[in-house]
């Protein structure tokens, strides 16, 4: 069972669009999709809203998406064709507490695609793609930590003359990795699809449910 992880250096760079695009492009894999969100202090994992709870039962929430309206990220995964879609929420730095639940989900899936950087601390995927936008300055520590584990880079197209907005960030760890230029709103190009298909070819997806 292959596990594909899609990461990125910050919010709103297209990670969800890449996951949805790959699900739609490779339906034979009958994907189970997971989105992992880590909230800062003072935010409840149960609903993502501000709260002052410090109880253990509010530090972790795992829910299966059933809504197919396409309004939420996990709903978009279902609309794209995922067999199942899960949303995992934990407090910042508490992802380890969610791993038993995540591993249980993965054990029952045919193929999994996960939107997260931090999960690389606990899982060695069969494929890790990172989405980078040179015009967005924020660069998560988790994205920088695991940059050297990326099998390929999906790089937002920018004018050559522009200097990346990142500060103190080196892309040397991925200089020798395949880099695919993306032009939103198209996040998954035919080249990206073929790269992923080729890397997962040894798993030969089945055509049955």
What are these regions (language model features)?
Residues 85-119:
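Phosphate-binding/switch loop-helix module in NTP-utilizing enzymes
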Residues 1:
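Phosphate-binding P-loop
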Residues 5-22:
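Glycine-rich phosphate-binding P-loop
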């Amino acid at each position: 069972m292959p596990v594909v992880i899609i990461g990125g250096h910050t919010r709103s760079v297209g990670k969800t669009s890449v996951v949805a695009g790959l699900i739609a492009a490779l339906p034979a894999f009958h994907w189970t999709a997971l989105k992992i969100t880590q909230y800062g202090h003072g935010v409840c994992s149960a609903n993502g809203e501000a709260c002052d709870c410090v109880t253990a039962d509010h530090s972790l929430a795992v829910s299966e998406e059933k809504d197919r309206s396409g309004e939420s990220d996990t709903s978009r995964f279902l609309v794209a064709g995922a067999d199942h879609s899960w949303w995992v929420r934990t407090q910042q730095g508490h992802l380890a507490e969610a791993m038993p639940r995540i591993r249980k989900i993965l054990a029952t899936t045919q193929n999994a695609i996960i939107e997260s950087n931090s999960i690389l601390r606990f899982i060695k995927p069969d494929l890790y793609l990172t989405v980078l936008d040179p015009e967005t300055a924020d660069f998560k520590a988790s994205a920088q930590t695991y940059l050297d584990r990326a099998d390929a880079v999906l790089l937002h197209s920018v004018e050559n003359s522009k200097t990346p907005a990142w500060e103190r960030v080196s892309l040397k760890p991925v200089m020798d990795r395949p880099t695919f230029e993306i032009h939103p709103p198209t996040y998954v190009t035919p080249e990206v699809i073929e790269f992923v298909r080729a890397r997962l070819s040894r798993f030969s997806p089945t055509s049955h449910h």
